[in-house]
Amino acid sequence: MTNATNYIETISKELNLTVAQVSATTKLISEGATVPFIARYRKEATGMLDEVAVTNIRDRMQQLVELDQRRDAILKSLDERNLLTDELRSSILKAETLSKLEDLYLPYRPKRRTRATIAREAGLEPLATKLFDQGSFDVFEAAKEFINPEKEITDTDKALAGARDIIAEWVSEDATAREQTRQLYRSKALVRCRVLSGKEEEGQKYRDYFDWTEPLSKVPSHRLLAMRRGETEGILILRIHPEEEEATQRLERDFVQNNSPAGEQVRTAVNDAYKRLLGPSIETEMRLESKKLADEQAITVFAENLRELLLASPLGERAVLAIDPGYRTGCKTVALSAQGKLLHHDVIYLTASERERMDAVRKVMVLIKEFKLQAIAIGNGTASRETEQFFKQLQLPKTIPIVMVNESGASVYSASAAAREEFADYDLTVRGAVSIGRRLMDPLAELVKIDPKSIGVGQYQHDVDQNALRHSLDDVVLSCVNKVGVEVNTASRQLLSYVSGLGPQLAENIVKHRDENGPFKSRAELKKVARLGPKAFEQSAGFLRIRDAKNPLDASSVHPERYDVVKAMAGDLKCTVNDLMKDPMLRQQIRLEQYQTEDVGMPTLTDIMQELAKPGRDPRSQFEAVEFQDGIEKPEDLKPGMKLPGIVTNVTAFGAFVDVGVHQDGLVHISHLSDQFVKDPADVVKVAQKVNVTVLEVDLARKRIALSMKSNPELGSTSRSSRPSDRKPQGRETAPPRPKQNQAIGNDWFSQALSKAEKHQKR
């Protein structure tokens, strides 16, 4: 059985899919198909798998390949050193996880010189073996035979100590012992966090974790990442371990056979193995494992927030006046055409003298009239509410909405290579205002130009695995761009680069071809683009739109490979494809089963019919502006009990942040998202969603605003429900175990580590 077959069967079982589904999907991926293409245009082959399922297959396949690569490297290393027995080879080939594989390899891994190594060099391994067998003999008499002053083994105590070091290493490297200890950590380890002495004032933002204990199995991802950040900043010290007594008792049951003198030597070695070797090793693993899990959860939150933001409702092709507000430096103002082209830029001053305000009124009214502007976009940063009030006082027609736009990342874009390339002759402030206006017109087209991490919808995004984050966010952007589709004759290079099958180089070639030869008149013309071969065309064509093309299907998501099916439908009804798209009565006469083939099944035919009814339909919802409450412009204006409109700016594992128009987002804790119990905030709210909230509490000193979405919330109730310090686990787990009378405080790992860290701080 080949590795590929093994992979397919493993994935099939893990994801509860048929072997045929997994096999077809992996084959398509290996042939260069993208996730959006497979999910959209190969439904018959995959059995209607969606993007999530296809992505899971792809990622799991990669993990299994990497596992086998590591397995092969280990087998090669052992074979080259003549250490590979048939039994060991069999165990390695059966290992299903990386941790199991590494456990098996650990005793044979080239290692630095250890206490056990030194003991072996002193000839103490036979003594260790004899002790480990735990027979009935005088251990001190046996140890006398191994006294060797030349090797610094000057008495029986040193001989026995060296033998115990060897036994301790055997125990710590035993694959079964490691796995059992690993499972103990996963089920019963406590996360213990304390503040370093003298760091209390500096670390006030971490004060909830100054003396914090919680089961590892229950700690939320955001809390673990917060504690780790505090540790990185030198404020906190974090440890993860179960009660030492339980861990050592389990090991003793496995390794100590009796209470003989030899058995007592083994018991001592086992305890040393756990404290000095196995415990710290598994703790390191658990830190990495829990961090990876927390990263995955944080990345999932970020990815879902990004998806909602990218798929936010577009204003559409309407000429816009965009403003990047400011006080001293004024408001950077730009007029944009319906296609987002910069028509004019200026600076207006709204918070200065009356003369300057009147000059601003004149400028704005001239711009609106001259360029027939149809909407006002205001960045939601500094001076945004004052700017909004200024425009409301102009009493513009109701057909011209005044919209607050989230400007997170606009400054990043304005300094980017893409912005410099497009607006080389304009400064950063003009570029930023343009980005704000375009973000209102089409959030997706504009946000793809910005590093997703700069958009401000993540949770500890700078603390998580950056490669995993980039991989996940790229998947989300790719998914969103292809879900909406791209107008090939107006799209930016950045937007085109996310189209299935293209990438940066082909996107650049398309723009270059468009600039040199004019707009594309058909999808078929894409084949003339340099280096855009048959595979790239297959993967991309269905997601690229050409408005007003001679063939109306070029403006739809019907793939060119299925044009003949639509032509056959039209031919059978003796009409044109255009007639078929315009006349629902004609479409009702189509009998889909007549057009089924081996490659074209009902899923594809159903998609085609939907496209004929609404060609190139935009899946994004209708645009609807949000107006903040007048007179509420800064945190000081907020009072408990106020009911306000707002917009969700970020969703996290512990709640949602909401902009109510005071330049500082408020938090709706998970316990206040609904009158019913909420397990996952993402089930209740989405980024860019419009909500109504009640102000619960305003802490100006800590810059915290507590909000509620409950119908009748208790004011001030968040002070106890939203802080982790008030949710410590009850019972024995609320604090580290007290040391026994014969157990010195210094023997506790945590106390030792804390003391060591504090000494390091003082140096």
Predicted feature residues:
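Short beta-alpha junctions and helix-cap segments that line functional grooves
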Residues: 320-322, 332, 388-391, 522-525, ...
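Accessory alpha-helical DNA-binding modules that contact the DNA backbone or grooves
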Residues: 34-35, 46, 50-150, 483-622, ...
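Long, charge-rich intrinsically disordered scaffolds of nucleic-acid metabolism proteins
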Residues: 100, 104, 403, 409, ...
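Low-complexity, acidic/Ser/Thr- and charged residue-rich accessory regions of DNA metabolism proteins
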Residues: 145-156, 213, 229, 248-274, ...
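A glycine-rich phosphate-binding loop feature that marks nucleotide/adenosyl-phosphate handling sites
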Residues: 183-190, 323-327, 381-386, 405-412, ...
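Duplex nucleic acid-engaging cores and interfaces of nucleic-acid transaction enzymes
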Residues: 53-56, 63, 67-77, 81-322, ...
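C-terminal accessory/binding modules appended to enzymatic or scaffolding proteins
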Residues: 16-17, 313-315, 478-512, 630-668, ...
